[in-house]
Design a protein with these regions (language model features):
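Detector for outer-membrane/organellar transmembrane beta-barrel domains
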Residues: 111-178, 186
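Cleavable N-terminal export/targeting peptides
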Residues: 1-27, 231-250
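Short glycine/proline- and aromatic-enriched beta-strand/turn motifs that initiate or cap beta-hairpins
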Residues: 21-73, 248-250
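Flexible, glycine-rich linker and terminal segments associated
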Residues: 179-180, 198, 213, 221-250
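Repeated loop/turn-to-beta-strand initiation elements of outer-membrane beta-barrel proteins
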Residues: 25-28, 59-65, 90, 94-100, ...
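Residues on the lipid-exposed face of transmembrane beta-strands in outer-membrane beta-barrel proteins
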Residues: 51-55, 86-90, 117-121, 157-161, ...
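Residues that define the transmembrane beta-barrel architecture of outer-membrane proteins
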Residues: 26, 43-49, 78-84, 111-115, ...
Length: 250
């Protein structure tokens, strides 16, 4: 896994440096983060490596690709999630963008598919991002006989405010629901500091809550991350939509 991963990163960096790529590449970012639950009986922590890149087809149309790898521990059990996604983006103006996305999270031979619509807006010191979509989970591993794919509605909103040229504050909310009685949500608040060469350090704390037919539980999470943006002033247009990013706090 490590050899393949290093090969992928090497090819991406080589591709980024080519002249033909620079003519169409409009933005991207690479981030490394660490997250964990702070008040749970289960020892839960892990790290995530995420990368996104965007290619402009024209002034209005662009395509974004996402790659994410998350490795974590829950109660002594180790696992990882590989996330791949693509976005089709329409840039309505310099400040507003709309898109559709489709992707898949994979872990131990099982997969979760997700797709939906999204929008983003940035003006002066404010950046907004939102999405609404469907997450399809194969119930086979969890229910005897299987029920096929179970579709869950998922939505999220995030806002970032630039306090000055260095510091930012942000907030986010993500929710996934099967019914009113079954679902989960995450709410978080964070701060960031942008250093030279578009390199940002950030930290976030928040709450994750789950509800299953009258029974609910919640826990506090915290994460830290380092992100390098390149090719454009904002990196890739949209955030990643995989489960590890949207609901697990990575």
């Amino acid at each position: 896994m490590t050899t393949n991963f290093c090969a992928i990163i090497g090819m991406c960096l080589t591709f980024c440096g080519s002249q033909s790529y620079a003519q169409t590449f409009s933005g991207g970012d690479i981030s490394l983060g660490y997250a964990g639950l702070t008040d749970s009986d289960l020892q839960t922590s892990g790290y995530a490596l995420n990368a996104s890149g965007e290619v402009a087809m024209s002034r209005e149309l662009s395509v974004q690709g996402d790659f994410g790898y998350t490795n974590g521990e829950i109660g002594g059990f180790d696992g990882d999630i590989l996330s791949l996604a693509a976005h089709g983006i329409y840039n309505a103006s310099e400040n507003a963008s709309f898109g559709i996305y489709v992707g898949q999270d994979s872990s131990d031979g099982e997969s979760i598919k997700f797709y939906g619509v999204e929008g983003g807006y940035g003006y002066n010191q404010i950046k907004l991002d939102g999405y609404f979509g469907v997450t399809a989970i194969d119930s086979g591993p969890f229910v005897d006989g299987g029920l096929g794919d179970v579709d869950l509605n998922q939505l999220g909103l995030s806002a970032t405010f630039m306090v000055n040229d260095i510091f930012t504050v942000s907030g986010s909310y993500d929710r996934i629901r099967l019914t009113d009685a079954i679902g989960a949500n995450r709410i978080g608040a964070g701060v960031g500091a942008t250093l030279r060469n578009d390199f940002e350090l950030a930290a976030e704390v928040g709450r994750i809550e789950g509800d299953v037919v009258g029974y609910s539980d919640n826990a506090t999470y915290a994460n830290v991350s380092a992100t390098y943006s390149f090719g454009g002033p904002r990196g890739a247009t949209f955030e990643q939509r995989g489960i590890a990013k949207t609901l697990l706090g990575f």
